[in-house]
């Protein structure tokens, strides 16, 4: 009798462990970062590290598809060409990662921003229009292959139309409000503010 009770307790424990494990797995989130590596290549604590500290249930925070000076047009072309990289000797396809992601964070064109955004009004207007069109097109392409939530960290000059369509997080505002140096690399305060804005969209 005692042996039967122990067996019942054992099997119940296994069952509860299995249920808890599956619940935990099903509630884990996959975050994919696309664009240039400007915001995540820094001596400071960057927003992706803040995210890892906060969310214990992150299954994967993938930033392998970020590259130097990446533009939104580059990302569009990479998706169209089913771009892949090698990780641990195996091919990892961008489109597959997009379909597996719950959240996709876009941040690109940073080099163009610093080059164009402090020029004359006509140049700024053209820059804003081009980037607006690229982001709208990129969002449309992503939506066809993934239901993931897309968050855009935008480097844009002040333009109402651009902000209306793509102003998820205005890096320009955060930079001038919290950056206490003229360095292009963002300090801890700006990185924390970016992280805080992302959390609002996640939650």
Language-model segments: which ranges?
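Alpha-helical cap/lid subdomain in secreted, periplasmic
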Residues: 86-203
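Conserved SGNH/GDSL esterase-like catalytic core that processes O-acyl groups on lipids
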Residues: 29-33, 38-126
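A structural signal for short coil/turn segments at secondary-structure junctions
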Residues: 24-27, 55, 145-146
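Membrane-interface motif at the C-terminal end of an N-terminal transmembrane signal
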Residues: 15-29
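Alpha-helical architecture
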Residues: 12-13, 34, 185
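N-terminal Sec-pathway targeting helices
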Residues: 1-12
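Compositionally biased amphipathic helical and low-complexity segments enriched in hydrophobic
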Residues: 7-8, 16, 53, 172-175
């Amino acid at each position: 009798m005692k042996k039967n009770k122990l067996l019942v307790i054992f099997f119940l424990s296994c069952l509860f462990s299995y249920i808890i494990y599956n619940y935990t797995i099903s509630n884990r989130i996959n975050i994919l970062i696309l664009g240039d590596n400007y915001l995540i290549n820094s001596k400071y604590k960057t927003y992706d590290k803040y995210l890892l500290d906060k969310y214990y249930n992150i299954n994967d925070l993938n930033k392998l598809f970020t590259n130097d000076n990446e533009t939104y047009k580059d990302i569009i072309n990479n998706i169209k060409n089913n771009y892949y990289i090698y990780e641990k000797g195996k091919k990892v396809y961008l489109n597959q990662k997009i379909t597996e992601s719950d959240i996709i964070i876009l941040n690109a064109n940073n080099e163009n921003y610093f080059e164009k955004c402090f020029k004359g009004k006509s140049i700024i207007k053209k820059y804003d229009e081009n980037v607006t069109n690229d982001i709208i097109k990129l969002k449309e392409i992503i939506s066809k292959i993934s239901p993931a939530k897309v968050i855009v960290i935008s480097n844009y000059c002040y333009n109402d139309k651009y902000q209306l369509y793509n102003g998820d997080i205005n890096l320009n505002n955060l930079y001038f409000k919290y950056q206490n140096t003229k360095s292009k690399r963002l300090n801890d305060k700006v990185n924390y503010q970016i992280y805080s804005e992302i959390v609002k969209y996640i939650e």
